[in-house]
Amino acid sequence: MIDYIKGELTFLSPTYAVIEAAGVGYQINIALTSYSALVGNEGQVTKLLVTEIIREDTHDLFGFFTAGERELFVMLMTVSGIGANTARMIMSAYTAAEIRQIIATGNARALSQVKGLGPKTAQRIIV
């Protein structure tokens, strides 16, 4: 398992970043909150904590600035009906602190406003 990747940020888009480390360019999926934090850092050494998702047809890396963001991402994926891309969409719509507050207050309505997330799945996140 890969814990983090540190290297030169060579490319940045709202959905992914490329970090070159030891001559290898790693495409790392990111949330919009991470994108906002990375804007202006292209060409600089950057460190992202990562979670690696390995499936039959793909190996994906998802990057985070803090351990708390990564823990929240992993926790969201334990909910039935939530995959890595849906978890990333949730984390693009709200900050980690906002998501924790939404869950703590039981505000399934706020979660169901995220694209691709219906009311039943939003309720499962709350529970």
Question: What is each of the regions a protein language model found here?
Answer:
Residues T121:
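Charged, well-structured binding/catalytic surfaces in domain cores that contact anionic ligands
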Residues M1, L72-T78, M89-I90, I102, ...:
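Residue-level recognition of specific faces of alpha-helices
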Residues E52, H59-F64, A84-I103, R124-V127:
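Amphipathic, charged-and-aliphatic alpha-helical interface segments
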Residues M1-T78, A84:
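Structure-specific DNA junction-binding interface
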